[in-house]
């Protein structure tokens, strides 16, 4: 099995899917995409596969639809046995390969770690996760240890103008119109 150019896992990568079991005898693998449009995972190249704490670069040689999913051929994997060794490994990409967004659009990963404060200056905590609910995205905010309202976590809808007043990338801060007791 030949991987290209290894790099330390600490280099930021964005996980976009997972490799499944091997398919056929020529080194193909099933792919499970985490992207909104599953086929868009193939828009990004190279892919990085986590191998023992290192990101190993692989180029996508080919891909095709198979039943209700996808299969992929990675460069350097030519036999089933080599492909089998990558079963259940995560697929990541370089975040720099993502399309640039307008000033008022955000990737979820940009919001993680941002401080959340009310319009009155009350510190609600830090964004630790995001949830997709269908109608709108929701910020998962871990409250400060000494939260005056005894909250450990808050779920705040990401509704621009209504709830989200300002997202300041520079200051790593989100200002919200939200009742701290809720």
Curated annotation (Swiss-Prot):
One of its GO terms (cellular component) is ribosome. GO terms for biological process: maturation of SSU-rRNA. Its main location: cytoplasm. InterPro entries: PRC-brl_dom (IPR027275), PRC_barrel-like_sf (IPR011033), RimM (IPR011961), RimM_N (IPR002676), RimM_N_sf (IPR036976), Transl_B-barrel_sf (IPR009000). Residues 103-182 form the PRC barrel domain. It is found in: Cytoplasm. GO terms for molecular function: ribosome binding. SUPFAM superfamilies: PRC-barrel domain (SSF50346), Translation proteins (SSF50447). Pfam families: PRC, RimM. Keywords: Chaperone, Cytoplasm, Ribosome biogenesis, rRNA processing. Belongs to the RimM family. Binds ribosomal protein uS19. An accessory protein needed during the final step in the assembly of 30S ribosomal subunit, possibly for assembly of the head region. Essential for efficient processing of 16S rRNA. May be needed both before and after RbfA during the maturation of 16S rRNA. It has affinity for free ribosomal 30S subunits but not for 70S ribosomes. The PRC barrel domain binds ribosomal protein uS19. This is Ribosome maturation factor RimM. It comes from Vibrio cholerae serotype O1 (strain ATCC 39315 / El Tor Inaba N16961).
